[in-house]
Amino acid sequence: MYEAVIGLEVHLHLKTRTKMFCGCRADYFGAEPNTHTCPVCLGLPGALPVPNRVAVEHGLRLALALGAEVPERLVFHRKNYFYPDLPKNYQISQYDLPLGRGGSLPLGERRVRIKRLHLEEDAGKSLHLEGRTLLDLNRAGSPLIELVTEPDLKTPEEARLFLQRIQALVQTLGISDASPEEGKLRADVNVSVRRVGEPLGTKVEIKNLNSFKSVQRALEYEIRRQTEILRRGEKVKQATMGFEEGSGKTYPMRTKEEEADYRYFPEPDLPPVAIPRDWLEEVRRSLPELPWEKEARYRALGIKEKDAEVLAYTPSLARFLDQALPLGLASPQALANWLLADVAGLLHERGLRLEETRLSPEGLARLVGLFERGEVTSRVAKSLLPEVLEGQDPEALVRERGLKVVADEGALKALVAEAIAAMPEAAESVRQGKVKALDALVGQVMRKTRGQARPDLVRRLLLEALGVG
């Protein structure tokens, strides 16, 4: 029996106005090529870097949220390698004194250990086409945080879930959009395969995976590939692999570098950055409620375990729910049900995100409250949702259209008698124990009330009138 051992290196683009070591704008996505550059990020002679305080603070927020140990000073190093989109021929990164060591992230019933977090600058972007390579250096020098896990992950599904959890965490902290589509969350995976109980196998790295699906597919293929090699009695070679989306296969890029190949040495143009303990405590106090804390609170409010998990790790839904709950207009579980089913379904159908609509927490809470109190039927409530999504007041809609549930038993009994008289065969079938025939009678009454009666009440009154049950 073989098992996989997986570790991740996650690169997160930090949400700052300017780059890591210069004043160029950091919002490179969609900009004209090579318009967000200066002598510092182009590596021109004599240009000196200056650390971005906001980027450092963002890194501290993540380190503290994960429970990592933060040193009293940060030291930056030069990581030397040659590639066309790295204009300085070195990357300013961190080596032996990173931003954080240790810590962990909850994943189900266990925790994935964090090895280290460090700050660094991003490289530019190469575009290969028609025998040429074009360079866009807008991204060069953008602030990144790299998070490295211990090899605690066992399956491709766990790796994908870990990345989704990290994305939710940094979005909750407000330090990164972490959008894979915009290149703001990228992952390298390290994977080896071994027989259960044996020492770790030879590690293979798969580089530059830019979607959760790609991470899962690349790992699935690579685990199969390594397992087949071991079953043939051969040895896996240490290498750096790429992933081809179309075929779903990994392919060798180059022999994997060792640490010494990068010739790390302290960045001579940057003195150590002190991290005073009072600054660290100030950052700690500013941390918001973290997703796993939010999940525990939702469960304490009576929200089902799986629903609480999905809501807590979907920041837009969590923010919405947290504004709706204090209003006291609907129960927590009912709000959760509507958000995860009806609202999510309508958003998917329209290709919208929640924040792109005019749906307010109060509007949804009022609509759900109308249904919970029995003032409108489920069918009516769901029919009003598209208009409430556009900012309409559900209570006003119900008033104006006369959509309130018909709860007057006297009026309903008259309609029940009419239905029985109009459908004598169905009524007789119910009397003879064929309860399924009751549905036709219920439907007749519901049509008379334009769907505004409670089906359970109509059923009870019909059974009473027919002398059944």
From Swiss-Prot:
<comment type="function">
    <text>Allows the formation of correctly charged Asn-tRNA(Asn) or Gln-tRNA(Gln) through the transamidation of misacylated Asp-tRNA(Asn) or Glu-tRNA(Gln) in organisms which lack either or both of asparaginyl-tRNA or glutaminyl-tRNA synthetases. The reaction takes place in the presence of glutamine and ATP through an activated phospho-Asp-tRNA(Asn) or phospho-Glu-tRNA(Gln).</text>
</comment>
<dbReference type="InterPro" id="IPR006075">
    <property type="entry name" value="Asn/Gln-tRNA_Trfase_suB/E_cat"/>
</dbReference>
<dbReference type="Pfam" id="PF02637">
    <property type="entry name" value="GatB_Yqey"/>
</dbReference>
<comment type="subunit">
    <text>Heterotrimer of A, B and C subunits.</text>
</comment>
<dbReference type="GO" id="GO:0050567">
    <property type="term" value="F:glutaminyl-tRNA synthase (glutamine-hydrolyzing) activity"/>
</dbReference>
<keyword id="KW-0547">Nucleotide-binding</keyword>
<keyword id="KW-0436">Ligase</keyword>
<dbReference type="InterPro" id="IPR018027">
    <property type="entry name" value="Asn/Gln_amidotransferase"/>
</dbReference>
<dbReference type="InterPro" id="IPR004413">
    <property type="entry name" value="GatB"/>
</dbReference>
<dbReference type="GO" id="GO:0070681">
    <property type="term" value="P:glutaminyl-tRNAGln biosynthesis via transamidation"/>
</dbReference>
<dbReference type="InterPro" id="IPR023168">
    <property type="entry name" value="GatB_Yqey_C_2"/>
</dbReference>
<protein>
    <recommendedName>
        <fullName>Aspartyl/glutamyl-tRNA(Asn/Gln) amidotransferase subunit B</fullName>
        <ecNumber>6.3.5.-</ecNumber>
    </recommendedName>
</protein>
<dbReference type="InterPro" id="IPR017958">
    <property type="entry name" value="Gln-tRNA_amidoTrfase_suB_CS"/>
</dbReference>
<comment type="similarity">
    <text>Belongs to the GatB/GatE family. GatB subfamily.</text>
</comment>
<dbReference type="GO" id="GO:0050566">
    <property type="term" value="F:asparaginyl-tRNA synthase (glutamine-hydrolyzing) activity"/>
</dbReference>
<dbReference type="InterPro" id="IPR017959">
    <property type="entry name" value="Asn/Gln-tRNA_amidoTrfase_suB/E"/>
</dbReference>
<dbReference type="InterPro" id="IPR003789">
    <property type="entry name" value="Asn/Gln_tRNA_amidoTrase-B-like"/>
</dbReference>
<keyword id="KW-0648">Protein biosynthesis</keyword>
<dbReference type="Pfam" id="PF02934">
    <property type="entry name" value="GatB_N"/>
</dbReference>
<dbReference type="GO" id="GO:0006412">
    <property type="term" value="P:translation"/>
</dbReference>
<keyword id="KW-0067">ATP-binding</keyword>
<dbReference type="GO" id="GO:0005524">
    <property type="term" value="F:ATP binding"/>
</dbReference>
<dbReference type="InterPro" id="IPR014746">
    <property type="entry name" value="Gln_synth/guanido_kin_cat_dom"/>
</dbReference>
